[in-house]
Design a protein with these regions (language model features):
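Short alpha-helical transmembrane segments in multi-pass integral membrane proteins
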Residues: 1-26, 81-146, 195-250
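Transmembrane helix-bundle signature of multi-pass secondary active exporters and lipid flippases
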Residues: 25-79, 107, 143-150, 244-264
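Helix-loop interface residues and adjacent transmembrane-helix termini in multi-pass membrane transporters
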Residues: 36-39, 47-50, 84-87, 162-163, ...
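Alpha-helical transmembrane segments of multipass membrane proteins
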Residues: 39-43, 113, 121, 155-159, ...
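Small-residue-rich hydrophobic transmembrane alpha-helices
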Residues: 53-116, 150-169, 264
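Hydrophobic transmembrane alpha-helices of multi-pass small-molecule transporters
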Residues: 65-68, 180-184, 214-218
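Alpha-helical transmembrane segments of multi-pass membrane transporters/permeases
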Residues: 104, 159-186, 200-203, 207
Length: 264
């Protein structure tokens, strides 16, 4: 008991909680903003029509399942990153980042291919209403291109969180949300001389927002981040030992999230 009390006295609890909240609050804001990008489509399309809203919402389920897989991929990457960040082994973190980006892009390409190549088939999984399917197909044929951008952004920014660069994601997601709101309003409702585009306008707004996220990520990665760099060779030449650890941490989460997502 005496040893325990001596140990607890050495902890600066005020500093501890300050550090925790410095990480937790920005991450909570990031998640809220990220959800807002998708929610903006739903809110604005609700004013256009029920069929349009239903089509976009059901089409969004494809992205939802993909996001769950991304969560599994980034979980494995962030666990490894946190371990090596404690050792200040930034070179290994770069290898983990490259591996995570490769895995995320593979998932994104598969989902983008499905969304662009067989959107009607995907929509029929969720509904048999031809009008809803038609609106969902319009949405998927545009928003499918954004999946690749999402892969880069989500993997990179989650790695940044693990090396204590949490405010980067907050700034990027905030700009993305504002852009999505503006482009959505202009294209969905035909403001500033643009034609009324409805569900296509919402899809273009989301695509522009996701593309802007990726551009900002790449600008930061190339010009500002001197600690952990994106190296193409790390995306192609995979470290077998790291790959095994990555799979051990990622696959259970991917399978769990995927089964849960398909069940809902």
């Amino acid at each position: 008991m005496e040893e325990k009390s001596k140990y607890t006295k050495t902890i600066n609890w005020k500093q501890f909680y300050r550090n925790v909240f410095a990480l937790v609050i920005p991450i909570a804001i990031q998640n809220l903003i990220n959800v807002g990008v998708t929610a903006t489509d739903v809110i604005m399309l609700g004013k256009v029509g029920e069929k349009v809203l239903s089509g976009a919402s059901l089409a969004g389920q494809i992205q939802y399942i993909m996001t769950l897989i991304f969560y599994g991929v980034t979980s494995g990457a962030t666990v490894l990153t946190a371990q090596y960040w404690g050792k200040k082994d930034t070179r290994t973190i770069e290898k983990v980042l490259g591996m995570g980006l490769s895995a995320g892009l593979i998932v994104a390409v598969v989902f983008a291919g499905a969304a662009l190549g067989m959107p009607e088939t995907l929509m029929r999984i969720y509904t048999s209403d031809p009008e809803v399917i038609a609106e969902g197909v319009k949405y998927l044929r545009i928003v499918g291109f954004s999946y690749v951008f999402m892969a880069v952004t989500q993997v990179y920014l989650n790695i940044m969180r693990s090396i204590e660069r949490v405010m980067v994601a907050t700034f990027i997601y905030l700009i993305s949300l504002l852009m999505n709101i503006v482009v959505n309003a202009v294209l969905i409702f035909g403001l500033l001389g643009f034609p009324v585009m409805g569900v296509r306008g919402a899809a273009i707004g989301t695509l522009c927002a996701r593309a802007a996220e990726t551009v900002m990520v790449l600008v930061y990665a190339i010009f500002r981040n001197k600690v952990v760099r994106i190296r193409l060779k790390d995306m192609v030449k995979i470290d077998k030992v790291l790959l095994k650890d990555f799979a051990v941490y990622s696959m259970p989460v991917v399978l769990n999230e995927l089964m849960w997502g398909l069940g809902t």
